Amino acid sequence: MSSNAAFTPPPDARAYRLRTARGEFAVVDSPVADGVEAKGTVLMLPGFTGSKEDFTLLHEPLGARGYRTVAVDGRGQYESDGPEHDEAGYAQAELARDVLAQVAALGTRAHLLGHSLGGQIARAAVLLDHTPFVSLTLMSSGPARISVSQQQRVKLLRDALDTMTMAEVWDVIQAMGPPEEVGAPAPAHGPGEPERLRGRWLGTRPAQLLATGRQLCTEPDRVGELAAVPLPFHVLSGAYDDTWPVPLLDEMAVRLDARRTVIAGAEHSPNTDRPEATARALADFWDGVPIRPRSAPHQ
């Protein structure tokens, strides 16, 4: 979760439900700035306990660089529908197919950006079919399972969800402090937004948290598979990360032959810790990616 989520989108952005072959998904769709040449479209996937609002502070600086940005709530996240208690609906393969349906509904090839858990879902989508995508950026998202310390926090959360209501669990999270992958009500931007963080938590389906929390603790290393995919890769993180230590992300970037960016002064959520620097690094990468024609699906 990005703890500094901003719930007020830019003035020109549209919040709506994106209709896809796999259902509707809540999105914030922010256009290219007036007078700026359009360069491409970006599909943004949030992390565990997060939502599309985690990318709010990136929309305007990326629009100024020529990029339309579409941030999405995945199945069962915040304002997107999903089963309340059936974890099977949140299997990683199902979430990956949702991403392919989302990009198809946008009607154009897109740069894919996944934060944390969203990066692992993005990786799974690209491994199913890379052809709808122009590039893949993994933001604070590592090669395999999360660190032992974060696994322990996620287990605490999953245990609490087995016996408590979402509202009761939220109160426990406040008492726990701000773990990177559990998500606490840390500062939000603007009056009333801490309460909106609570509303986001209450809108998230318990089964989504249980299933994806388990995925974070068991995800295998699929970097070798990903490296065989013919896409440009970008590994971006803050200067400190307890979920996937920075040296692990450095090594993953080498294995992927990826561009590597470390955002000074940022931790697990550079998108909210240092949005201007993060947007600049993202746009610099995308500016250098050639737009190739659609090729045959990856097998």
Task: Indicate residue ranges for each PLM-predicted region.
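Active-site loop/oxyanion-hole signature of alpha/beta-hydrolase fold enzymes
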Residues: 10, 20-21, 64, 70-113, ...
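Conserved HGGG/HGGXW glycine-rich cap/lid loop of the alpha/beta-hydrolase fold
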Residues: 26-82
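Short beta-to-alpha linker loops that shape the active-site pocket of alpha/beta-hydrolase fold enzymes
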Residues: 73-78, 142, 266-267
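Flexible "cap/lid" loop of the alpha/beta hydrolase fold
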Residues: 123, 127, 133-164
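Conserved alpha/beta-hydrolase catalytic His-Asp/Glu region
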Residues: 147-152, 165-227
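Catalytic active-site module of serine/aspartate enzymes centered on a nucleophile-bearing elbow/loop
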Residues: 257-299
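Alpha/beta-hydrolase fold catalytic core
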Residues: 1-42, 64-67, 107, 134, ...
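Conserved loop-alpha-helix segment in the C-terminal half of the alpha/beta-hydrolase fold
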Residues: 230-266, 272
